[in-house]
Amino acid sequence: MGVVSQGPVYYDLFEEFADLATQGMCPLGAPDERGHKDGWGLACFQDGALKFHMRDAGSAADASKYYGTAWKIAKLNIERAPGRSLIVMGHLRRASSKGLVAQRFAHPFVEERNGVTWAFQHNGSLVSTPVDGDKIDSQILFQMLLNHLEGREHEAVAKATLTARALAIKEFGGFTGLNFMLSDGRSLHVYRDFQTNGQYYTLYLDNLGEMIVAASEPILAMKAEPIPRGLLHTVSSDLVLQRTAVS
């Protein structure tokens, strides 16, 4: 989930999102017992600065820390002051391997580069992930993006995405899904791509008035039409949308 809002981000949204931990679509085409209960995380930028970052192993639907953090975020910008903005990212994890269920592997991941704080979350996996107990494939993808970013603007992220995609194919044999959201606090970048199971690796994007919401499955009153594969969408803090074909 990713939200760019000029007002508050309602608590109802966090509740509905948490329900996807048990009710969300799974790779076989329907919810299953495993669900997306191997980790959760929330990151919130207020006016470009990282305000909250909380994550843990386990299911968001059962986590008091998840709801507590969501409540704190929901109280921000209630006054709708002009020029203020919120960018919120949320992730529910379904681990590719049960041995990799741990807090440190919960998304979104946050890293500072050249004075800029980036948050990143991903759905999918690399075909041949290196045996490295310190990083999962999503973290490797994050590093590839950051290593090839030449700026913060839409065009720079599109270029880095193209390079990271090519490296994923060349060095790791490709990917199942390359769906990700990336933010520097000023914009939210949303990308959908897959080489298998496109009915599972979906991403939806909708303008709900004072906020634009992106999610793997429609929540609240989002339209049920996924964004096209291979098209990077960038939402600025003033809700301007840019698109660029990457693949």
Q: How would you name each of these model-derived features?
A:
Residues 57-77, 91-114:
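Short acidic (Asp/Glu) patches
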Residues 1-66, 190, 195-198, 230-247:
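Extreme N-terminus nucleophile/cap motif
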Residues 118-128:
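Conserved beta-strand-loop-short alpha-helix elements that form
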Residues 132-170:
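Glycine- and acidic-residue-rich phosphate-binding/metal-coordinating active-site segment common to enzymes
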Residues 196-231:
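A conserved acidic, glycine/proline-rich C-terminal tail/linker
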Residues 3, 88-91:
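A short, Trp-centered hydrophobic/proline-enriched beta-strand micro-motif
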Residues 25-31, 87, 154-194:
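Catalytic core of PPM/PP2C metal-dependent serine/threonine phosphatase domains
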Residues 42, 89, 141, 180, ...:
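A residue-level signal for conserved active-site and pocket-lining positions in enzyme catalytic cores
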